């Protein structure tokens, strides 16, 4: 979920030509800082009719009940034609609304099954630059193919 769209605004400011945000919270568009946000429930099989060069999902998976995690992963992977940046809270991280914290290796294994390769060096680089402490343990970068 993109929340109010802050990351979307940053990507757009840096010149990305097409930036869409998807959020599961109903009526999020009324709270958003970015105009191109759509409500989408990623616990249900979805196809938005477009693939993106990059899909970024940060700290969303841990809010998805375990019985829907495969659908969530399938959705974000299907939307990504090239690259996927994913973070998922690890066990013991804690946080409001966390119902499904997972070890990084479990997430990596799921995404690899969807046709992606884990980018260890790039993941490590992004983790080292992260400003939020939980991202230092959870950012994972994948490339299709």
Indicate residue ranges for each PLM-predicted region.
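Residues that flank catalytic or metal-binding motifs in active/ligand-binding sites
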Residues: 15, 103, 135-138
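Short aromatic-enriched loop/helix-cap "lid" or pocket-rim segments at secondary-structure transitions
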Residues: 31-34, 69, 95-99, 130-134
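Conserved S-adenosyl-L-methionine
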Residues: 116-127
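C-terminal alpha-helical "lid/dimerization" subdomain adjacent to the S-adenosyl-L-methionine
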Residues: 89-97, 119
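Conserved SAM-binding loop
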Residues: 1-92, 105-108, 143-144
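Core SAM-dependent methyltransferase catalytic element
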Residues: 129-145
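A short acidic, often aromatic-flanked loop/helix-cap motif at beta-alpha or helix-coil junctions
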Residues: 45-47, 125-129
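Short alpha-helix
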Residues: 100-115
């Amino acid at each position: 979920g993109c929340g109010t769209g802050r990351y979307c605004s940053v990507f757009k400011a840096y010149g990305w030509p097409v930036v869409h945000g998807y959020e599961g919270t109903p009526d999020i568009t009324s709270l958003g800082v970015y105009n191109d946000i759509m409500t989408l429930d990623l616990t249900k099989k979805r196809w938005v009719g477009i693939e993106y060069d990059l899909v970024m999902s940060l700290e969303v998976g841990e809010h998805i009940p375990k019985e829907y995690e495969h659908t969530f992963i399938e959705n974000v992977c299907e939307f990504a034609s090239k690259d996927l940046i994913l973070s998922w809270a690890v066990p013991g991280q804690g946080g409001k609304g966390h119902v499904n914290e997972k070890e990084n290796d479990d997430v990596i294994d799921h995404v690899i099954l969807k046709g992606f390769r884990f980018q260890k060096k790039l993941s490590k680089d992004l983790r080292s630059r992260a400003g939020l402490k939980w991202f230092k343990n959870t950012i994972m970068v994948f490339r299709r193919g």
